[in-house]
Amino acid sequence: MTTLLELKEKLTRFYGKYDIYITPVIKFTVALTAFLLINHNIGYMEKISSTPIALILALICSILPVGGAVFIGSVLILLDMYALSLEVCIVALILFILMYILYFRFSPKNEYGVLLTPICFGLNIPFVMPVGMGLLRELYSMFSLVCGIVLYFFLNGVKQNETTLSGVDEKDAATSKIVVALNQLLGNREMYLVLAIMVVTLVIVY
């Protein structure tokens, strides 16, 4: 535990000293990685799912507050969901509204958590997030971690069920799509287990 506290102090001092140089690079890298992963995994709208567009958007994000990358990423996801299915897009929009309410209410200064958590899951290194946030952020950063986890499992579930969700637009099919999309959140026991483990890990490290 002492070693973790010493590491936390060293990282905080280093970042504070070189903040003006490190921050734009981090913003660009995180945004670009997020946009490329979105394109790779759920790039259903081909017009916006190209590397040049991802690069341009990431450059814009490097001069914006981190919340700008969160907003742009949300728009890209909604457009991709719309290209897949209107019903899924509506469910995603409701999810984002709820997440933004939770995020702005409890953890408005932890935008990186929302972006980096799905990225780390995509790179198969999810436990970097609770450990890193426990070392570098405040305890309330768990809310941005929760938002990131929920977002990852929702998008991963959509990807796994894309054949069903992109079916013909009939009345029964539309209802089925909504049920499938909602089930990625409400019926996902794995997500709830991961949420509990990650939050407990963050609290222990903190």
Task: Give, region by region, the residue ranges found by the protein language model.
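Membrane-interface helix-loop-helix junctions at boundaries between adjacent transmembrane segments
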Residues: 59, 72-148
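Hydrophobic transmembrane alpha-helices
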Residues: 20-74, 81
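Alpha-helical transmembrane segments of polytopic integral membrane proteins
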Residues: 31, 35, 113, 125-129, ...
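Short, Lys/Arg-rich, polar N-terminal cytosolic tail immediately upstream
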Residues: 1-18
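Generic multipass alpha-helical transmembrane bundles of integral membrane proteins
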Residues: 130-206
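Structural signature of hydrophobic alpha-helical transmembrane segments
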Residues: 42-52, 80-94, 187-195
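Hydrophobic alpha-helical transmembrane segments of multi-pass membrane proteins
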Residues: 22-25, 119, 188-195
